[in-house]
């Protein structure tokens, strides 16, 4: 059982280790924190913390550094102090959505890089699932004899448009009718939808045209649902270079794999969550991931993560994510 004094010493060692990047000795701890105890007392408490697996001792230094268990205990204390009060939330994402003309991909890309600049670590932002971002309206516009423009408007206000190559001759009224048909039906590909399209279409060519549009929209939705925006990867590489060069490659491979997506998709609440080292993956020991959710207008939500070394400035990152809504 850890005592309150041992917990205070552990917290001080973690913060000094993050600041200095080297093992912390008893004298340095007393000098930096003006502790009113003897070096012998501090050394004894540090030995107790080492026996409890909260600290590690290296052969090349008389000081000690936090273990993963030590970082875990430190972070758990921080999270207990964190309050998720909406009154301090910053509606930055909604501002970015407006600034980027309701283009969610552009807004999230800006957001990932902006958050990386503020946190000084790498960030990952996962796009909201399209199952939550429902299609509100579809419009077909004839540009010329061979090109049509497909405009998709989502309930978030996000707008996308695509150019379609088609020489099919359709009147303005018929284009409106087809647009309304697609807007008013569940366009998930199914035998039932195929029957509806067949009954609605005026010709085999029109039937094929509508089916092609439905397939294209479904393919686009499937690709977009797994979109991840990475900001500040170089910041993570720089931070890891200072501690363990050999760890960079497996970490980058992890971040570029589906495993990170699966991890982020387990986030189901607004609570901030911190995973450290092997808690993330058995092959990882040098990084931590701080995760939370973000929201657009209370209706759409996705996952966000700040990724840095285990010696991360956790308090700053937690406070930063706590302000995001």
Swiss-Prot record:
Pfam families cross-referenced by the UniProt entry? HrcA (PF01628)
Q: Which UniProt keywords apply?
A: Repressor, Stress response, Transcription, Transcription regulation
Which molecular function GO terms apply here?
Answer: DNA binding
* An annotated GO BP: negative regulation of DNA-templated transcription
Superkingdom, according to UniProt?
Bacteria
Q: Does the keyword Electron transport apply?
A: no
Q: Which HAMAP family has this protein been placed in? A: HrcA
Q: What does this protein do?
A: Negative regulator of class I heat shock genes (grpE-dnaK-dnaJ and groELS operons). Prevents heat-shock induction of these operons.
What family name appears in the similarity comment? Belongs to the HrcA family.
Q: Which PANTHER family match?
A: HEAT-INDUCIBLE TRANSCRIPTION REPRESSOR HRCA
Q: Know the name of this protein?
A: Heat-inducible transcription repressor HrcA
Q: Which organism is it from?
A: Staphylococcus haemolyticus (strain JCSC1435)
Q: What is the lineage of its organism?
A: Bacteria, Bacillati, Bacillota, Bacilli, Bacillales
| Gene name as annotated | hrcA
């Amino acid at each position: 059982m850890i005592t309150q004094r041992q917990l205070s010493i552990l917290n001080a060692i973690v913060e000094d280790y993050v600041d200095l990047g080297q093992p912390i000795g008893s004298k340095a701890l007393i000098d930096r924190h003006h502790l009113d105890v003897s070096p012998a007392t501090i050394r004894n408490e540090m030995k107790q913390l080492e026996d409890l697996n909260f600290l590690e001792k290296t052969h090349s230094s008389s000081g000690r550094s936090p273990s993963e268990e030590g970082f875990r205990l430190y972070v758990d204390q921080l999270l207990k102090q964190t309050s998720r009060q909406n009154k301090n939330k910053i509606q930055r994402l909604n501002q970015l959505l407006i600034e980027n003309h309701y283009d969610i991909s552009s807004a999230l890309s800006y957001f990932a890089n902006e958050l990386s600049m503020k946190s000084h670590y790498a960030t990952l932002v996962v796009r909201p699932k399209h199952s939550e971002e429902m299609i509100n309206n579809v419009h077909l516009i004839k540009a010329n004899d061979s090109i049509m423009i497909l405009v998709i408007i989502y309930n978030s206000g996000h707008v996308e448009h695509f150019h379609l190559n088609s020489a099919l001759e359709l009147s303005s009224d018929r284009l409106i009718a087809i647009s309304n048909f697609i807007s008013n039906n569940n366009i998930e590909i199914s035998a039932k939808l195929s029957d509806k399209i067949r009954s609605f279409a005026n010709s085999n060519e029109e039937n094929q045209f509508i089916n092609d549009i439905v397939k294209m929209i479904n393919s686009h939705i499937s690709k977009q649902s797994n979109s991840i925006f990475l900001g500040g990867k170089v910041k993570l590489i720089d931070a890891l270079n200072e501690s363990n060069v050999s760890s960079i490659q497996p970490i980058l491979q992890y971040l570029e794999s589906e495993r990170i997506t699966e991890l982020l998709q387990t986030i189901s609440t607004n609570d901030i969550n911190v995973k450290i080292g092997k808690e993330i993956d058995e092959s990882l020991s040098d990084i931590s991931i701080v995760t939370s959710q973000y929201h657009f207008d209370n209706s759409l939500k996705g996952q966000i993560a700040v990724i840095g070394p285990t010696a991360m400035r956790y308090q700053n990152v937690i406070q930063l994510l706590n302000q995001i809504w």
